[in-house]
């Protein structure tokens, strides 16, 4: 798999999402039992940290992905995982276009149903799933709601489904690598006495911004 290859080739796995999708990057980043070569691209401008409505407007702007990209050390042959439930907004689409142009393998985690029922907000007319080397469908219905209460939609499923998919990929990656006898670059829990992740920090901190 792409994640396993990244570990064996000493490449970085970059994870990007806007709005609530960025939480899937946090789920994978510097996490107990998680891979140390994962770089969560966390830019306050496109999350809720600097204002929810503000972030919702900014993720539709073209030109921002390039600015965010330049804040990170991203190299050819790295892996890029982009999460967007709708797959339509300009920033994730533009980030996908940039990743492909720079020679990265691109994984998209998205709702195919939602994507098929909306128009792209990027000038290319492309949606995220159309640009990826590998598409992971979270199977969440259009509108990101799993329940109906007298006509009121609720029960958002994209974050839960996305985290489950991401952690399942992690588990399969570790299973594959361990079967091949590869040393696993995995964080231990800082809340268990005797933990020591210093070797992992020293190896990756120069390449991973928020570590």
Task: Describe each PLM feature range.
Residues 9, 34-36, 175-211:
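Active-site phosphate/pyrophosphate-binding segments
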């Amino acid at each position: 798999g792409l994640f396993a290859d990244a570990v064996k080739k000493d490449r970085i796995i970059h994870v990007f999402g806007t709005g609530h999708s960025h939480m899937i990057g946090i789920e994978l980043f510097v996490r107990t039992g998680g891979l140390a070569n994962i770089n969560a691209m966390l830019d306050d401008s496109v999350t809720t940290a600097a204002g929810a409505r503000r972030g919702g407007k900014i993720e539709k702007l073209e030109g921002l992905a390039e600015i965010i990209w330049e804040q990170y050390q991203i190299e050819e042959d790295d892996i890029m995982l982009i999460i967007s439930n709708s797959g339509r907004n300009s920033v994730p689409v533009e980030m996908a276009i940039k990743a492909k142009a720079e020679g990265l393998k691109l994984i998209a985690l998205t709702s195919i149903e939602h994507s098929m029922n909306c128009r792209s907000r990027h000038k290319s007319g492309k949606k995220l799933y159309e640009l990826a080397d590998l598409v992971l469908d979270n199977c969440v219905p259009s509108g990101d709601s799993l329940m109906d209460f007298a006509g009121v939609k609720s029960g958002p499923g994209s974050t839960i489904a996305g985290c489950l998919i991401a952690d399942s990929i992690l588990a399969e990656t570790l299973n594959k690598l361990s079967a091949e006898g590869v040393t696993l670059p995995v964080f231990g829990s800082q809340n268990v006495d005797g933990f020591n992740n210093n070797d992992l920090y020293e190896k990756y901190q120069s390449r991973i911004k928020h570590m």
